[in-house]
Swiss-Prot record:
Chain span(s) of sequence motif 'HIGH' region: 40-50
Protein name: Leucine--tRNA ligase
Substrates-to-products reaction catalysed: tRNA(Leu) + L-leucine + ATP = L-leucyl-tRNA(Leu) + AMP + diphosphate
UniProt keywords, alphabetically: Aminoacyl-tRNA synthetase, ATP-binding, Cytoplasm, Ligase, Nucleotide-binding, Protein biosynthesis
Principal place of residence: cytoplasm
The species this protein was found in: Nitratidesulfovibrio vulgaris (strain ATCC 29579 / DSM 644 / CCUG 34227 / NCIMB 8303 / VKM B-1760 / Hildenborough) (Desulfovibrio vulgaris)
EC number: 6.1.1.4
Classification via PROSITE patterns: AA_TRNA_LIGASE_I
Localization of this protein: Cytoplasm
Family, as annotated: Belongs to the class-I aminoacyl-tRNA synthetase family.
Cellular component, GO annotation: cytosol
Coiled-coil regions listed: none
Matching CDD domains: Anticodon_Ia_Leu_BEm, LeuRS_core
Enzyme class: ligase
């Protein structure tokens, strides 16, 4: 009988769906395991990256079920956002119609791969049933002071017609469309993620045993904690001051000028009435539209313009010119930097370019730095010089002494600064969750009443070809009544950043059909945190950081009782073609649907899991998938050939008594060694490729042993046990193949419900071992001896082995070297 993967796979997929075998409920008396892959944007078709990601998750889910866990393995759709809106506009259709058609198609594709999802828990973030709870969270955050509105310069994508969070700007370009990002003054809604900066940083230590260090490091760097001091510099000729943040208060005596950001609020005041005002304004306008990341680059050419204003160094009394510089950012620290060119490389380059003074205040041991001959700033440790009463102090000690002085005199204070900035969630696009806020001329900004949720995104709108939102031009949406005074009012027409939806979806899965609440405390307590989260490392900062923040904010609003959403994280590698990322523009895309039609879902899954460890990239290869296809066929033919013999003995687990011959004993040993190896590789290490390799070796052993073992009943029992083990071990990887062959062997229960096999210690002990016998290091014979033979018995048997005896004639045996379990070397002369 030919292996017809198409009919076999679709038949088993229907059986699984009809039986609800993968549905789960909260069972307080059973250990839980929550495995989750990052849900996809419904683009219309899955790609090979999806296949790899979801195949990894499915193996984990199936393996954990076999270990006795109550497994939650859900799937849904990250369905709002720019891609869907832009694609719908391009194709002349409505984003909702486009999105739901894509969801239907991708759901069918995922089902065709045989993933063991609980489809009852499916969510789509673009439905009112989902985003009503997100709007509730917004109102509770607003009530708690975690949401605020302000006007500020924002990252603006002219092509997408919306603002971008700092994390969504990659090297000055929009993360979605690669357009150059501009700066635009807008009033926006923000979430106070900075309120959680320290906790987000500190709690990374809780994840050290479960998350990749690379991701932890990326989050630490993005949060960017700096310990230092704020110092006030009086403005010359004015009753005002300008404050800087510095991590190097020990260098205060070397500050010779000040650099401020083009966006600094004092720029206009400082240049008012100055002859260079127009030059400064032109410089500010040019630099403000530069990418913030580029402005921090070490290779950036340092540029600036003198404001004509001065400040006064509080320690030296020296007047310091104030410059606007391109490398100073308004959002870092205070937007002003005390420039110490002798001890900061950026300041050094700037001072050299504009001929500004330098003052050495830290000398390395045994050297005397001279500003006139320095080729770079001295940024290492040393002793203070030219620093008044602090001369001679080690610079680390001086940091504390000078900070003490600042706090005593009132000129400054110790402080901590973070690179992290509050999360701008306002988007000027249509396809997103409406922000539940109303503007009333009489009452101001008014939150929508909770009982009026959801604020439904209207579907009866006409989208604009250029991407502008239709909501500000849809009176039926924005015209409303003020919840406070009952007067005429206007709804907010911005929608929420789609990363808001993905920041809490993992919690909704625990109670996805609840229409009275986003989730219940019992469901959350039982299922959370997610035991194993799986997704790409590209989400390290955006999605993963936002989800961690959202969990803590929901906790503080009384919704959740935990601190971290994901206990363990696996970041899978990419599927490449000829070393490059697959993309339509490169013409190197492999279509999963085509591969499934040609080879079957099991083969596609198997290849994606066998090609490389899950965290590493791998190259797609025709020879590789052909090899996986041959293996699937090999297993099919093995069981088909042995079927009648195996049906005769029935299902059994062979015993030591059944393994009467060396071949039987070796196969039984191989079976149990494979169970141990595969279990170790899957149990939290997730080394799928080596687990599969071990099963392949067992299949090879079966082929070598089958002809001898079918001859008697005890041998057939050993065969039956080993074949059953192969099908059980393969079931997480190739579930359709395993189900079909299991049924062909007369079993009525699903292989998916079987427990993971257990290996027996006694089966791993060999009764005999094979030793190589050498004479003067050259192979002359082999010995099969009892495993517990003594050294003396081994020597005697080796010296009397017939082939060896021929090489001992006429020579003198000087020494016999025995390496237990491996070889005997007879030294002669």
């Amino acid at each position: 009988m030919k292996y017809d993967h198409q009919s076999i796979e679709t038949r088993w997929q229907k059986k699984w769906e009809d039986s609800g075998i993968f549905q789960c409920d909260t069972e307080a008396d059973k250990p839980k395991y929550y495995v989750l892959e990052m849900f996809p944007y419904p683009s219309g078709n899955i790609h090979m990256g999806h296949v790899r990601n979801y195949s990894i998750g499915d193996v984990v889910a199936r393996f954990k079920r076999m270990q006795g866990f109550n497994v939650l393995h859900p799937m849904g759709w990250d369905a709002f956002g720019l891609p869907a809106e832009n694609a719908a506009i391009k194709n002349g259709t409505h984003p909702a119609k486009w999105t739901f058609a894509n969801i239907d198609n991708m759901r069918s594709q995922l089902k065709r791969l045989g993933y063991s999802y609980d489809w009852q828990r499916e969510v789509a973030t673009c439905t009112p049933e989902y985003y009503r709870w997100e709007q509730l969270f917004f109102l509770r955050f607003l009530e708690k002071g975690l949401v605020y509105r302000k006007k500020a310069a924002q990252n603006w994508c002219p092509k997408c017609h919306t603002v971008l969070a700092n994390e969504q700007v990659i090297e000055g370009l929009c993360w979605r469309c690669d357009s150059a990002v501009e700066q635009k003054e807008l009033t926006q809604w923000f979430l106070r993620i900075t309120d959680y900066a320290e906790e987000l940083l500190a709690d990374l230590s809780k994840l050290e045993n479960g998350w990749p260090e690379r991701v932890l490091s990326m989050q630490r760097n993005w949060i960017g904690k700096s310990t230092g001091a704020e110092i006030r510099f009086a403005l010359d000729g004015r009753d005002d001051s300008i404050t800087v943040f510095t991590t190097r208060p020990d260098t205060i005596f070397g500050a010779t000028f000040m650099s401020i950001a083009p966006e600094h609020p004092l720029v206009e005041e400082l240049i008012d009435g100055k002859p260079q005002a127009d030059d400064v304004r032109a410089f500010v306008e040019r630099i403000r539209n530069m990418d913030r990341i580029d402005r921090q680059s070490d290779t950036l050419e340092k540029e600036g313009v003198f404001t004509g204003a001065y400040c006064v160094n509080p320690f030296t009394g020296r007047k310091m010119p104030i410059w606007v510089a391109n490398f100073v950012l308004a959002e870092y620290g205070t937007g002003a930097v005390m420039a110490v060119p002798a001890h900061d490389q950026r300041d050094f380059e700037f001072a050299r370019k504009y001929d500004l003074p330098m003052q050495v205040v830290i000398q390395p041991q045994g050297e005397a730095l001279d500003p006139a001959t320095m080729s770079a700033a001295w940024t290492e440790a040393g002793a203070l010089v030219n620093s008044g009463a602090f001369d001679g102090l080690a610079n680390e000690d001086a940091k504390q002494r000078i900070a003490d002085d600042l706090e005593t005199t009132g000129n400054g204070r110790r402080t901590i600064n973070y690179r992290l900035r509050d999360w701008n969630i306002s988007r000027q696009r249509y396809w997103g969750a409406p922000i539940p806020v109303i503007y009333c001329d009489a009452c101001g900004v008014v939150p929508e009443k909770e009982e009026n949720l959801p604020v439904v995104l209207p579907l009866d709108v006409k989208t604009h070809d250029d991407g502008r939102s239709p909501l500000p031009h849809t009176p039926a949406f924005y015209e409303c009544t003020c919840p406070v005074c009952g007067g005429k009012a206007r709804r907010e027409t911005d929608t929420m950043d789609t990363f808001v939806e993905s920041s809490w979806y993992f919690a909704r899965y625990t109670d996805a059909t609840n229409d009275k609440a986003p989730f219940t405390p019992d469901a959350l307590r039982y299922w959370l945190p997610v035991d194993q989260y799986i997704g790409g490392v590209e989400h390290a900062i955006l999605h993963l950081l936002y989800s961690r923040f959202f969990t803590k904010a929901l906790r503080d609003c009384g919704f959740i009782e935990l601190d971290e959403p994901f206990a363990n994280l696996l970041t899978q590698g990419m599927v490449l073609m000829d070393g490059s990322k697959m993309s339509k523009s490169k013409g190197n895309v492999v279509d999963p649907t085509e591969m499934i039609a040609r080879y079957g879902a099991d083969t596609v899954r198997l290849f994606c899991l066998f090609a490389a460890p899950p965290e590493r990239d791998f190259d797609w290869s025709e020879s590789g998938i052909e090899g996986s296809y041959r293996f699937v066929g090999r297993v099919w033919r093995l069981v088909e050939e042995l079927r009648e013999h195996l049906l005769a003995v029935g299902a059994c687990s062979s015993t030591a008594e059944d393994a009467k011959t060396p071949v039987a004993r070796e196969l039984r040993l191989k079976e149990h060694a494979t169970v141990r190896k595969a279990g170790d590789d899957l149990n939290d290490r997730f080394q799928f490729n080596t687990a599969i390799a071990a099963v392949m070796e067992l299949v090879n052993a079966l082929y070598l042993a089958k002809d001898e073992l079918v001859a008697d009943e005890s041998g057939r029992k050993v065969l039956s046990s080993a074949v059953s083990t192969v099908l059980t071990l393969l079931s997480p990887f190739t579930p359709h193949l395993s189900e079909e062959l299991w049924a062909l062997l007369g079993h009525t229960e699903s292989v998916s419900t079987l427990p993971w096999p257990r290996w027996k210690e006694d089966a791993l002990v060999r009764d005999t071992v094979t030793l190589v016998v050498q004479v003067n290091g050259k192979l002359r014979g082999k010995l099969d001896i009892p495993a517990d033979a003594s050294r003396e018995e081994v020597e005697t048997l080796a010296l009397n082995e017939p082939n060896v005896l021929r090489y001992l004639e006429g020579v003198t045996v000087r020494k016999v070297v025995v390496i237990p379990g491996k070889l005997v070397n007879v030294v002669v002369s």
